[in-house]
Amino acid sequence: MDDKSMARGRKAFVTGFPIKHSRSPLIHGFWLKELGIDGSYEAVEVKPEDFSSFAASLAANGFAGGNVTIPHKEAAYAAAESLDEAACAIGAVNTLWLENGRLCGGNTDAYGFAANLDASAPGWDKADRALVLGAGGASRAVVHALLSRGVCHVSVVNRTLSRAEELAAHFGARVYAHGWDEAQALVSNAGLIVNTTALGMSGHGEGQDFPIDLTCAPKEAVATDIVYVPLRTAFLNKAEKAGLKTVDGLGMLLHQAVPGFERWFGQRPQVTQALREHILADMAKAGAL
């Protein structure tokens, strides 16, 4: 039996609360059509208080697995009977699947972050030092990716220093916590600068100047933002003006979807320019560029 026959009729999902904004159905729908797989991928809105029962009934509802987004990533971590290495390190699950009747959880955010940089800024992991702006949930995946790829020194900057200290303590050696007032000084020797804050994204001061001068960064430094709405954030605009190589956050969204699709439907999809343009067209239609 070939892979397409095995995947026939398989169902997968993305769940969050709210979920109508998700572009995951567009991504997976594109791949299902491209690969000629007779499967489906749907958005399912689940309230936080209902998540445990939803996760427990995946098989009964005919799902092979699915993606989990805000606010359910920690609840999915708790619900999974088995976790992959990335999920254990990050403390959150964004991908669920069933294996011999057991609910398994993984985290593909770190993979997506690194794969996006591999595609758009090859050699980025030669940087000895990285600067991560923000210490929220998303920054954990970024730090895990950086450590996994051998970055020697990761500085995490946050307005609330205790959040950065908590993250540094979680990962241990090679991760250092700093207050926001130290960010400017840290830019000068950072080979990779990652923005994980909401500054400059839609509804969070878009159009305003990013509050850090990037002109003192090494000329070979790479600047990347995990935000993809808007596509060109205030941070990326400022980095570009400073002459730095910039990588937007859309690629992370596309690449993080690859491992889950392969698990549920049995074929590994490709992140192509055609897929990117498909998502950009939807973003333009929604006024999200």
Curated annotation (Swiss-Prot):
Its EC number is 1.1.1.25. Keywords: Amino-acid biosynthesis, Aromatic amino acid biosynthesis, NADP, Oxidoreductase. PANTHER family: BIFUNCTIONAL 3-DEHYDROQUINATE DEHYDRATASE_SHIKIMATE DEHYDROGENASE, CHLOROPLASTIC, SHIKIMATE DEHYDROGENASE. This is Shikimate dehydrogenase (NADP(+)). The lineage of its organism: Bacteria, Pseudomonadati, Pseudomonadota, Alphaproteobacteria, Hyphomicrobiales. SUPFAM superfamilies: Aminoacid dehydrogenase-like, N-terminal domain, NAD(P)-binding Rossmann-fold domains. Homodimer. Involved in the biosynthesis of the chorismate, which leads to the biosynthesis of aromatic amino acids. Catalyzes the reversible NADPH linked reduction of 3-dehydroshikimate (DHSA) to yield shikimate (SA). Belongs to the shikimate dehydrogenase family. Shikimate binds at residues 22-24, 69, 94, 109, 228. The active site is at 73 (proton acceptor). NCBIfam families: aroE (TIGR00507), PRK00258.1-4 (NF001312). Pathway: Metabolic intermediate biosynthesis; chorismate biosynthesis; chorismate from D-erythrose 4-phosphate and phosphoenolpyruvate: step 4/7. The gene is aroE. NADP(+) binds at residues 85, 134-138, 158-163, 226, 249. One of its GO terms (cellular component) is cytosol. It is an enzyme of class 1 (oxidoreductase). It catalyses: shikimate + NADP(+) = 3-dehydroshikimate + NADPH + H(+). GO terms for molecular function: NADP binding; shikimate 3-dehydrogenase (NADP+) activity. It comes from Brucella canis (strain ATCC 23365 / NCTC 10854 / RM-666). One of its GO terms (biological process) is amino acid biosynthetic process.
